[in-house]
Amino acid sequence: MQNCACNVEFQFDNSAEKLVSSLEYMLGQITGNIPPHADKDDILFRCKVIITELLTNAIKHAGRGSTRFDIEWDAEKLIICKTDTGMPLYLVNTRNNTTNGKADLNKRLISADFLNSLYAIWENENHIRFASEEGSLDDFRPVEQVMEHFGILIITRSSDEFTYTYDKATRSNVFRVKINF
């Protein structure tokens, strides 16, 4: 493990055929850079889940062209960024919400089931942080209401921080995942 901040860039062509080889490549870049004090198996499992979900998201939503992945690390953390261009995540335009009759412009429940509630928390107009809270059997909802945003939940639960930013000037969608060592 190097003591400096390091970065690897990877272009993914958004094809299902390249998902496994792309996942293996990115995990290979991460494997040798996990510091000795970190739980290597835990970090690699979380990275595998997160990267698989980000690659799948690119195939489903990024459209033509390619998606850029940046992997950055230092002695304290690992950052995985996925950047594509196009329309913003639909949540950017759904900020207004009412909770218990009171307007809550910064936090919105976007999905829930008996295990988890998933929230979008607006840091500003185009920047969303995701958070989840564990549910209980008392919170059980009918099957029709079970997680619509399961991929976002998977990444949120597997990371220490998960954010989304839409850059209007470049029409870029940036999904940023942080894992602490």
Positions of the model-derived regions?
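Conserved polar catalytic motif of the HATPase_c/GHKL fold
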Residues: 52-57
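Conserved beta-strand-loop-beta-strand hairpin that lines the nucleotide-binding pocket
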Residues: 2-6, 59-181
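Bergerat-fold GHKL ATPase/HATPase_c domain
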Residues: 1-49, 60-61, 67-83
